[in-house]
Amino acid sequence: MGHMVNAIYQIDEFVNLGANSIETDVSFDDNANPEYTYRGIPCDCGRSCLKWENYNDFLKGLRSATTPGNSKYQSKLILVVFDLKTGSLYDNQASEAGKKLAKNLLKHYWNNGNNGGRAYIVLSIPDLNHYPLIKGFTDTLKQEGHPELLEKVGYDFSGNDAIGDVAKAYKKAGVSGHVWQSDGITNCLLRGLSRVKDAVANRDSGKGYINKVYYWTVDKRATTRDALDAGVDGVMTNYPDVIADVMNEAAYKNKVRLATYEDSPWVTFKK
């Protein structure tokens, strides 16, 4: 996953470096409308924190990059994580944010269900209290007559909360399946893999809530190896070419590969 891809031109940049997935920040205005693809300060070391687009413009650019037949089409780009910056919202605005997010995606990315972008979407929410965003989103797609698009949507709570607490939030949101569990910290700091291992154990137990586990932000070869050894399904990185190099090492090249569009992002990989 290419990290912090907030300008349209960066889509090609990160995919050309080897990413098959990107992460994009989404900020909201005071009325819970998704407004900009903007992170702001602070962000990862060695990166510009200030690149941005109007959210709807970014969606149109993303649609071009993920629609077969379009001149801008990038066949390798199969999944997009929207890092929803809901910290600016009151808890009681979460549902409204989900409704507006759904309408924006439906119009500007999915083209109202008419040959829109094909990438899978993960809605990544930083606060467990904002679980109503999910129901606002799913209910709106159903009300707009496009429940089939929910097959393209997954969910993530990104606040590094206890695994049991995350499970409770999903239960409240009515979610069972399509769950990616993130764990991580900015590349400026160190973080162990104990919670990643807990998430992997939940995924592999056959009775947990997690379908996939990803770790962020992974920029070094040693950290990449540690994450792969821990059994993650994906890593978020500022340097996709570094990840590609490690995956081609003798220890990994016959064990892991980049996912393609034919691989379901919602089905747990059985070893």
UniProtKB/Swiss-Prot annotation:
<keyword id="KW-0479">Metal-binding</keyword>
<feature type="binding site">
    <location>
        <position position="23"/>
    </location>
    <ligand>
        <name>Mg(2+)</name>
    </ligand>
</feature>
<dbReference type="GO" id="GO:0046872">
    <property type="term" value="F:metal ion binding"/>
</dbReference>
<dbReference type="Pfam" id="PF13653">
    <property type="entry name" value="GDPD_2"/>
</dbReference>
<comment type="similarity">
    <text>Belongs to the arthropod phospholipase D family. Class II subfamily.</text>
</comment>
<keyword id="KW-0443">Lipid metabolism</keyword>
<protein>
    <recommendedName>
        <fullName>Dermonecrotic toxin LhSicTox-alphaIA2bv</fullName>
        <ecNumber>4.6.1.-</ecNumber>
    </recommendedName>
</protein>
<keyword id="KW-0460">Magnesium</keyword>
<feature type="disulfide bond">
    <location>
        <begin position="45"/>
        <end position="188"/>
    </location>
</feature>
<keyword id="KW-1061">Dermonecrotic toxin</keyword>
<feature type="binding site">
    <location>
        <position position="25"/>
    </location>
    <ligand>
        <name>Mg(2+)</name>
    </ligand>
</feature>
<keyword id="KW-1015">Disulfide bond</keyword>
<dbReference type="InterPro" id="IPR017946">
    <property type="entry name" value="PLC-like_Pdiesterase_TIM-brl"/>
</dbReference>
<dbReference type="GO" id="GO:0005576">
    <property type="term" value="C:extracellular region"/>
</dbReference>
<dbReference type="GO" id="GO:0016042">
    <property type="term" value="P:lipid catabolic process"/>
</dbReference>
<keyword id="KW-0442">Lipid degradation</keyword>
<feature type="active site">
    <location>
        <position position="3"/>
    </location>
</feature>
<dbReference type="GO" id="GO:0016829">
    <property type="term" value="F:lyase activity"/>
</dbReference>
<feature type="disulfide bond">
    <location>
        <begin position="43"/>
        <end position="49"/>
    </location>
</feature>
<dbReference type="GO" id="GO:0008081">
    <property type="term" value="F:phosphoric diester hydrolase activity"/>
</dbReference>
<comment type="function">
    <text>Dermonecrotic toxins cleave the phosphodiester linkage between the phosphate and headgroup of certain phospholipids (sphingolipid and lysolipid substrates), forming an alcohol (often choline) and a cyclic phosphate. This toxin acts on sphingomyelin (SM). It may also act on ceramide phosphoethanolamine (CPE), lysophosphatidylcholine (LPC) and lysophosphatidylethanolamine (LPE), but not on lysophosphatidylserine (LPS), and lysophosphatidylglycerol (LPG). It acts by transphosphatidylation, releasing exclusively cyclic phosphate products as second products.</text>
</comment>
<keyword id="KW-0800">Toxin</keyword>
<keyword id="KW-0204">Cytolysis</keyword>
<dbReference type="GO" id="GO:0090729">
    <property type="term" value="F:toxin activity"/>
</dbReference>
<keyword id="KW-0964">Secreted</keyword>
<feature type="binding site">
    <location>
        <position position="83"/>
    </location>
    <ligand>
        <name>Mg(2+)</name>
    </ligand>
</feature>
<keyword id="KW-0354">Hemolysis</keyword>
<keyword id="KW-0456">Lyase</keyword>
<dbReference type="GO" id="GO:0031640">
    <property type="term" value="P:killing of cells of another organism"/>
</dbReference>
